[in-house]
């Protein structure tokens, strides 16, 4: 990863933050993005402490102008874009389908699906100009499973996987690989909000064949691998990092 330029959306917490640290420790130049200036600048400073060149750029992936500026600033600062990790997401509304609204649907899909589409649009343009690149979209094991009372989130992650595989085929001969990483139950703030109680969280962990929740750093290892040259013959793939959850 040394000298490669990596852009990560939703980078300020959880899996995004762990991925930023993992890439920085491997010598990549890292641009982290999110919507909280203080946290973003602090993360960039932390990444620089590992010897990485790092920048924070505030952007809302739901807004195309923000995404365009994010990619343009990345290329202007570092000259290219080698790896894009589209991680920005929200857990959305949890509850029965009878309680969902147009607003709860839009709130989830605008970030989890539209945000990925807009990000890929501008990332691909930058990568096409240089003739190479890697895109890693962050899905979930719920991107190929069902989950009661999480229909909107599950639907959004199914969409991410379908978009990933379709764009991978679209770009297969262009030098750009497109893959997804699907975390299983991972100990993040989003999971804590999603499960609601410590008891629910423990029950979810008990369903994992390896007997525990994953750590963000373990998902980050999968992201770094799928973006690396070791995975050069892999495109259109969804890599489960889930402790065996999807095989259960």
Region annotations inferred by a language model:
Residues 140:
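Residue(s) in the substrate-gating loop at a strand-loop-helix junction
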Residues 37, 161, 178, 182-193:
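Short, flexible catalytic-loop segment of classical short-chain dehydrogenase/reductase
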Residues 125, 169-173, 232:
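Alpha-helical segment proximal to the catalytic Tyr-Lys
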Residues 120, 156, 164:
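Active-site helix of classical SDR
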């Amino acid at each position: 990863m040394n000298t490669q330029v990596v852009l990560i959306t939703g980078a300020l917490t959880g899996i995004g933050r762990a991925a930023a640290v993992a890439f920085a420790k491997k010598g990549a130049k890292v641009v982290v993005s999110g919507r909280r200036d203080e946290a973003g600048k602090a993360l960039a400073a932390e990444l620089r402490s590992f010897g990485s060149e790092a920048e924070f750029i505030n952007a809302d992936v739901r807004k195309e102008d923000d995404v365009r500026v994010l990619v343009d600033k990345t290329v202007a600062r570092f000259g290219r874009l080698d790896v894009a990790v589209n991680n920005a997401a929200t857990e959305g509304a949890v509850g029965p389908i009878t309680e969902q609204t147009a607003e709860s649907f839009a709130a989830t899909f605008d970030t989890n699906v539209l945000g990925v589409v807009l990000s890929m649009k501008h990332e691909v343009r930058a990568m096409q100009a240089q003739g190479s690149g890697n895109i890693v979209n962050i899905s979930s094991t719920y991107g190929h499973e069902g989950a009661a009372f999480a229909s909107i989130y599950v639907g959004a992650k199914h969409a991410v996987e379908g978009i990933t595989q379709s764009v991978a085929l679209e770009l297969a001969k262009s030098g750009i690989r497109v893959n997804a990483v699907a975390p299983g139950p991972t100990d993040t703030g989003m999971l804590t909000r999603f499960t609601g109680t410590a008891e629910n969280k423990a029950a979810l962990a008990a369903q994992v064949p390896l007997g525990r929740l994953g750590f963000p750093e373990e998902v980050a290892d999968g992201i770094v691998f799928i973006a690396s040259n070791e995975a050069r013959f892999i495109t259109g793939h969804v890599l489960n990092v889930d402790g065996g959850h999807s095989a259960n």
